[in-house]
Each structure stands twice: as structure tokens, then as C-alpha cells.
Amino acid sequence: MKFASSAANVTGKKYASCEAATWLNEHFLSSLGDIRKAVDLFFLAGINHVYYHGTCFSPQNEPWPGFLFYAAVELTPANPLWRDFSGLNKYIARVQSFLQQGMSDNDVLLYFPIFDRYADYGRGMLEHFDAISPAFNGTPFRTAADEMIKKGYGFDYISDLQLTNTVPLEGLLQTEGNVYGTLVVPGCKYIPVETFSHILRLANGGVNVIFLGDLPENISGWADVEEKTAFFESLKSGIRFAPTNNPQVMKASYGSGSLLTGSNLEQLFTFAGIPRETMTDHGLAFVRRQNLNGTVYFITNDGDKPFDGWLSLQAGGTSAAIFNPTDDRTGLAKTMVGTGGGTEIYLRLNPDESLLVQIYETGQKGRLYQFYDPVSSPTLVSGTWKVEFMEGGPSLPKPFEAGSPVAWTSQEGEDYDNFSGTARYTGDFTKPPLKADSWLIDLGMVDHSASVTLNGEKVAVLPGPGYSFIIGRKLLKTNNTLLIEVSNLMANRIAWMDRNGLPWKKFYNVNMAARLRENNKNGIFDASDWKPVESGLPGPVKITPLRKAR
């Protein structure tokens, strides 16, 4: 993913766009929550424009599921999840509205050693370079990229041609469209002599260049090999590394700049004065951009534990604001000046939750972004739950009642197992006798998306992966009715069709290939052996009184 965004960032392009989630899971097994988590990874990699994938025209009167082709998430109106697709689209639109402003703000350029791959003998006639293939596993290049992501260093890949178009600028590297603090050349075996010579010119102009591991061993290619090799060796012979006050860093002064080498990348960055974002130590991931207002961060919690505390950011400013792309809540952040002139903000992030943080260079006025603390333990929404099937097929199962929310696939009967569509869960509850500023409604487990109506007012569309939301205290009455419309995957109905030999792979040149070998029968996808995918609202549904955090 960073291949595309790096090219855009280095050359100063406004957009880095991608086809997203096409083969996320096997056909019919991707939820909107799965897509949301995948799209977050695209954003973190520097992508700022998502267009999902193509989908084919299907006549209105075509029997379900209409015309489908190989794009495995099958985002079409025939998919029950289409009802709640707007929730995911609004989230993506809010994030993109920030990430499409300004320019990327990465500190490091990582040289892509393409000639090491060219020199390696492989089994195939063609190797694709649309991602970091397994062939890079264990290489200094892959190790450096993984470590920078883990340690919180923003970086872009750079090619030989892009590097030769880069010039020194007051100790920094100015590419065709951006500025960076240093260049990392990961221990590569081969490099064009023209590239190596230009790297030394950058150092001569004041840039600090990091050679991770050692200098390149040899030149690439066979054209004028003797002449180029002699020139390459003469350049290397003019480099004299000497110890520094850091035993893990060797330095060679070169003109106005320097060449650094060592095996510990973090120590090399520290010596070169390249800062990192320490939020990654807390299981958080980020992408950072500069815009007209200052600096914006897109931050996600990739870990399995909630984050609650002060977060140090490298960007300096006079104020900050928080924007929640999931529910559109906004407000100013509590801030203080951090060490080194950066900003510290108070933040809470649950696992799989994302926030946008805008650091402003000028003071901003407004209300604080509101975090909440629970007043008491959650209360279960118990009692009789009515379940009615609204739309879908192959037929609408009979309605049923249960003492708590349950998956409809837990009911006896093939109609429940085969159904793909939407069911309405209705539960009544009494407001707990507690004072609260707001209330948290948590649906528990949802299979696989939901829209929620409280006392006749639509209050949430929940595509996942999270299924909780906050409501104002005035929305909760003494006696309340909660309607939860749950939509599941296409999988169960498709499996029923395959078991019964009903044709649906009918679109010309459909290319309906299976992603997994066990689903490939006679060279085409087949779901007839699938067991029912759990569907509905296993819950439990809980409500929690909240007070404003001080």
C-alpha cells in the first residue's frame, strides 16, 4: 500500500487512491466491519482516496443475487449489508476530508533496493512489485520498514529515479514534491553507480545519510561494468567512518553533511536527530499530514487494550481539536506543551477506534471534546425480545420471541439457517433510576451490521467493528422501546442455493474463482459444504449511565 502513497508523497501528488477490499475474505464472508478495519490500514499507509472496487450492472428484475463477478466482498444492492453501507461511507468520507488536505509529513526516505531483487534468481518468469513480496522477508529493507512502523517513524519509499531528482535543502532532502529529514539505504548488495554517486552529492550538500548495516557491495548491471566499478570503488575509498560518542554509530563527514552507519536503526535516527511518535509504544498507529491549519493526525488503536491518558505528539501548536469520524462528534482537546516543543493531548481510544487530531498553529475557541466516565455498572436490557424478519430470503422465517437477544441461526429450522436479509429485534426497558449526562448503549455482538431506533427516533447506524454508541440524556424516557434492525451476510443464502443446485453464477465471463482451495469445486467457487454463519443479535444489549469526565 505504501508503494502507491510513497510515489504520491515524494512527487507531491494530492491523491493516493486505491482499490480496496476486493479480495478481503472468501466470497460473501466480508462484513462492513472487516472492510472498515482494512480501510484503516490503507489510511495508515498514506492512502487518502478509497474507491472500493468495480461492480457489474444487474437488471432490476434479475432474481437474487443478480449479476455478480469475482470481487469477493460483493458490495451490491443485493447484499443485505447494503442497508447500513452508509455508515461506513460516512466514516470514510470524514477521514478523507482531512487526509486529502495539505501534504504528507514523513521524516524518512527509505531507498527501495530494486536491483537486489533483479539479481535474485526466482522460480517464475515474472515477479510483481505491487507490494512487498515474501521475497523481501529477512532483508535489511523489510526489517527497516517494519521497525519504523513499529517505532513510530513516518517514512516513504524512494526509487533510484526519484532519488536522482532529489536535491539538498538546508540539511534536508527536497524531492519533487516534499521535504524529508534523512535517507536510509538498507544494507543492499547492488546499486546503480549513478544512484550511489548522487547520494554522496546529497551528503556533500549537507544531508545526513544513513547506511543501515554497511555500504552497498557492488554496482548493478553489466553496461560499462569495468569503468563503473572503478568509479564506484573510488567513491567508496573516499569514505572514512570513525567512532562517535554513541558506540552503535559510525560517522564519516562528507562535505557539509555526513554518512552514518550501524546496525541499530533507532540509535542511528537518534544520532541524526530524527524524532519518532511514541504513541506506537501504546499500541496506537498513525499517519501525519501538514495542512493550512497546522498538522493533522489520523490515529487508530491497533491494540487489544483501551488507551486512556496523555499522548505526546511531535507536532507543535497552540491548540488542538478532536474529530470522531464514526459519530461526527467534535471538540477541542486538553493540551499542554510537551518536551522538545511538541504537543501533549489527553485522549481515549478503545480497540479498533479511530480519531482525527488537528494541531492548530493559532488559538481556537470552543467546547472541549467530551469524554465520559460510567456512573455505575451496565444494566442488561432484559425481558422479552421480539424478532421479526423484514426482508431477504430464500423465505422469511417465522417471527419468534426470546428472553434475551439471540442469533436467529440459534433457532430450530432450516429457514433460519438459510436466511440472508434483515430482522428487527424489539426490546422494551425501563430507564435505570440514576442521574446521567448521557447514556452508552452497547449492543454486544452483532452479526453483522445494525441500525438502531430508540422511541421512534433513529439514533445510530453501526456497520462495525464496534457496536456501541452514546445518546443524550433527553432521548431516554421512563419507558423505552429499542428497535434494532440487524442485517447479515449473503453467505447462508448462497450456500443454500449451491446445495440445491440453483444457478446464480450466470454472468458472462464471471470468473467466480474461490479464494480458498476448500471452496473450489471443478475450478469454480462453491459454498454447498458451508455450515450456517451465525447471524443476528447474540448481544447482550446493555445500557450504562455516563457523566462527563473532568
Model-identified regions with their sequence ranges:
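Carbohydrate-binding surfaces of carbohydrate-active enzymes
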Residues: M1-T422, T430-A436, L462, G472, ...
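Aromatic-lined ligand-binding clefts that engage carbohydrates, nucleic acids, or primary amines
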Residues: S312, F429-N455, L462-P463, L482-V486
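Short, well-ordered loop/turn sites that connect or cap secondary structure elements
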Residues: L349, V452-L454, L475-L476
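Short, well-structured beta-strand segments enriched in hydrophobic/aromatic residues
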Residues: S354-V357, W439, L476-K505
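Glycine/proline-rich low-complexity spacer/linker segments in large multi-domain proteins
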Residues: G363-G383, V387, S487-P540
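Aromatic-rich membrane-interfacial microdomains
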Residues: V459-F469
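Short, surface-exposed tryptophan/glycine-enriched loops
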Residues: F469-N479, M490, K542-L546
